[in-house]
Amino acid sequence: MKKPVFFLLTMIICSYISFACANISDYKVMTWNLQGSSASTESKWNVNVRQLLSGTAGVDILMVQEAGAVPTSAVPTGRHIQPFGVGIPIDEYTWNLGTTSRQDIRYIYHSAIDVGARRVNLAIVSRQRADNVYVLRPTTVASRPVIGIGLGNDVFLTAHALASGGPDAAAIVRVTINFFRQPQMRHLSWFLAGDFNRSPDRLENDLMTEHLERVVAVLAPTEPTQIGGGILDYGVIVDRAPYSQRVEALRNPQLASDHYPVAFLARSC
């Protein structure tokens, strides 16, 4: 009789520890500028994006810039998020990577901000359904919004800074910091990844000018992330996030765009 009780107690303790220690570094995260455009986008979603998400090695969360339209096989759930005063909607879809009899569902959170060409839209694909969805208003009239999903106390966001040097890159980080400084948000850990169109060194200098360098850490790969050279795709993590120093950025070799995907994975202890 003692063994079953001991086993049950052990399971409860392990479950509690697992829940209590859940943090951003527990997730396999990736960002990718898809260079989306019409028919080619559908192919990239069904081939390249699917590869990044599938199997045990697949990422848990994929941030997509220039996402184009969602794949035609994605099914709208009816969940429509449009925060008051922001005016930028996000729609939730389910996307089955498996078969009808053996489903493998992912959740797509898609923001159709490019109502004309439908090319430079933003999307986040998640293995888990989001508890919350966030939209941070654009930093300038020309800028794009920051969108994000919340899984428990962890928030994953993506952004696409303006071309020609990412003049709004630092403002994107500042707006994100200020949003999560609100009293009702301070308990959350957040991670922002995307195409900043600016080198990580330059962004770090910008953050130092604004005295924000101690609030966040920039996580960037050491290899160029764009075909023309330059490291433009990387992440920014709030320093209060548990185990934030354990996460490293690595360039993925897949090339079906003018940008490489960049993965953020926990370093081995």
UniProtKB/Swiss-Prot annotation:
Xref: PROSITE patterns: PROKAR_LIPOPROTEIN
Localization annotation: Secreted
Upregulating conditions: Expressed only on infection of host cells.
Enzyme Commission code: 3.1.-.-
Keywords (A to Z) from UniProt: Endonuclease, Hydrolase, Nuclease, Secreted, Signal, Toxin, Virulence
Record carries keyword Lipoprotein: no
Signal peptide: 1-22
GO cellular component: a single term: extracellular region
Pfam families: Exo_endo_phos (PF03372)
MF GO annotations: endonuclease activity; toxin activity
Domain of life: Bacteria
Enzyme superclass (EC): hydrolase
Protein role: Produces a CDT (cytolethal distending toxin) activity, which causes DNA damage in intoxicated cells. This damage induces G2/M cell cycle arrest, chromatin fragmentation, cell distention and nucleus enlargement.
UniProt miscellaneous comment: Unlike other pathogens possessing a CDT activity, S.typhi does not encode CdtA and CdtC (that form a heterodimeric subunit), which are required for the delivery of CdtB. It means that the CDT activity of S.typhi is strictly dependent on CdtB. Both CDT activity and expression of CdtB require S.typhi internalization into host cells. S.typhi is the only Salmonella serovar that encodes cdtB.
Name recorded for this polypeptide: Cytolethal distending toxin subunit B homolog
Highest classification ranks of the organism: Bacteria, Pseudomonadati, Pseudomonadota, Gammaproteobacteria, Enterobacterales
Gene name for this UniProt entry: cdtB
